[in-house]
Amino acid sequence: MTLSDEDKITIEKFALQNAVKYGKAPQLGAVMGKVMGLCPHLRPLSKEVGPVIQHVLDEVMKEVPEEWQARLEVIAPELIEELNTKKEPDKGLKPLDVKEGESVVMRFAPNPNGPPTLGSTRGIVVNSEYVKRYGGKFIIRFDDTDPQTKRPMLEAYDWYLEDCEWLDAKPDEVVIASDNMEVYYDYARQLLEMGHAYVCFCEGGDFKKFKDAKEPCPHRGHAPEVNLEHWDKMLAGEYEEKAAVVRIKTDIEHKDPAMRDFGAFRIVKTAHPRPEVDDKYVVWPLLDFEGAIEDHVLGMTHIIRGKDLMDSEKRQGYIYNYLGWEYPKTTHWGRVKMHEFGKFSTSGLRQSIEDGEYSGWDDPRLPTLRALRRRGIKPEAIRKFMIDMGVGETDVSLSMDTLYAENRKIIDTIANRYFFVWDPVELEVEDAVCCTVNPSLHPSEDRGVRCIDIGSKLLVCKSDVESAELGDMLRMKYLYNIEITSVSPLKCKCIGDSMEDAKSNKMRIIHWVPEDGIPVKVLAPQGEFIGMGEKQIVDELDNVVQFERFGFCRIDSVDDGVVAYFTHK
């Protein structure tokens, strides 16, 4: 038993449906699974079906996405309809616990030691979206009270606000923690006076021994007036770094060592990078203390934080109980890992930039919003990507392909099409007739044509012709059919312009650029692509275009040749 023509059409349908659905090359396993699931008579022929499917996939990949869609509409319009009507799984944000008529106050609190990354973007988008839905106030609070270990960058304050506005998440209020040091000092003094805090002079290793043994350190029992005296000396700069720490009294026998008398203030004599602050303060709050005070002072109603910060909530609970405050409603979410970037930290990226490994914070290899924006990723796509992810404690592992799919829905209808030939080689067309061709700027949107003047020589991708042999026939897209007449030097002759002939002879379709094209350099996460492109590309500065058979790119500059940033396939 062999495969019938009907079986082969069925395979092509499912291959095209997979390609259209995901906007990229169809996967052999996925197509095989669907074919075997819906065509039981083919199951005994799996060894024969596999190569046929692979051949179909190879043919599909010779075409561009617009041609996939057009072909599928012809041979299986019902599969197009199925893609459009298939119910999406439940996505998005769950309702907040909000009383009727209550407005919400929510915040995103970054350390401005670098620009926003994909990791921090989730907090910006989700918190701002909840405020949009329920009404209230969205606050950006810069937790910049660590001038030494996670030292803030002055530029990052503005970068965060710029990126928030770009993401349609402009804050209603901006708070800078280092402006509020006197507020933290005031509450520290109150806790010292109440006997709920003390100044500890133990060296780190010594305090750990007491903590691990569930025993109080010698300073825990000091009277409030003694602690206040030490506190004033700390503020006056009379103690050296690491000589004294303010600790919050908790349960010294708590089963979790992290809960036992945690640190609230430490001495840091490194000047703050903000000129308004500089060396004005030498006693700095740790994040658990600063965040606890700010969340109350700002009237926070709901907090969304990583599940890795559950201990912070418990520690802050002691401060809230001592001061008679009610803790905001809190939701936790799991970590998000993007396959393409693995584990990264802002401080690590900063060091790599300083070491010259990356060109800057907008290097296309980085997971920063500045890099994604420069590549042509749209803010609407990022918002939808983050909102669809929802809020849950389960760790999430995702591919950038998911974000790219959302972005493709936005840019596909607005991106004009052009040819870009990377690693170009010259192809001489014998007896060529000079002419002008006018391909559409967009396959489905009526927005005009490109004007390409053709001479006797074309530039093509080396990979398209490096294995060419005498007599090979190729279709030059939008132009004519050719036959290779010489491989060194590379020459061909025109054998007509019939698309039907190209199909019947199963010619590969390749793209090209006239010999007087313009230099183009594409910067991509995987490296640089150097080549030539159509002259009209210079009119697309700051726009996202599609280089046919290559992918979407944002045109970054056109001053000395074209420099483009790769968006995605």
From Swiss-Prot:
A motif ('HIGH' region) lies at residues 110-120. It is found in: Cytoplasm. Its EC number is 6.1.1.17. GO terms for cellular component: cytosol. One of its GO terms (molecular function) is glutamate-tRNA ligase activity. Gene3D superfamilies: 2.40.240.100, HUPs, Ribosomal Protein L25, Chain P. One of its GO terms (biological process) is amide biosynthetic process. Keywords: Aminoacyl-tRNA synthetase, ATP-binding, Cytoplasm, Ligase, Nucleotide-binding, Protein biosynthesis. It holds the Pfam family tRNA-synt_1c. The keyword Protease does not apply. It catalyses: tRNA(Glu) + L-glutamate + ATP = L-glutamyl-tRNA(Glu) + AMP + diphosphate. Transmembrane segments: none annotated. InterPro entries: Gln/Glu-tRNA_Ligase, Glu-tRNA-synth_arc/euk, Glu/Gln-tRNA-synth, Glu/Gln-tRNA-synth_Ib_cat-dom, Glu/Gln-tRNA-synth_Ib_codon-bd, Rbsml_bL25/Gln-tRNA_synth_N, Ribosomal_bL25/Gln-tRNA_synth, Rossmann-like_a/b/a_fold. It comes from the Archaea. SUPFAM superfamilies: Nucleotidylyl transferase (SSF52374), Ribosomal protein L25-like (SSF50715). The keyword DNA-binding does not apply. Catalyzes the attachment of glutamate to tRNA(Glu) in a two-step reaction: glutamate is first activated by ATP to form Glu-AMP and then transferred to the acceptor end of tRNA(Glu). NCBIfam families: gltX_arch, PRK04156.1. Belongs to the class-I aminoacyl-tRNA synthetase family. Glutamate--tRNA ligase type 2 subfamily. This is Glutamate--tRNA ligase. It comes from Methanococcoides burtonii (strain DSM 6242 / NBRC 107633 / OCM 468 / ACE-M). The gene is gltX.
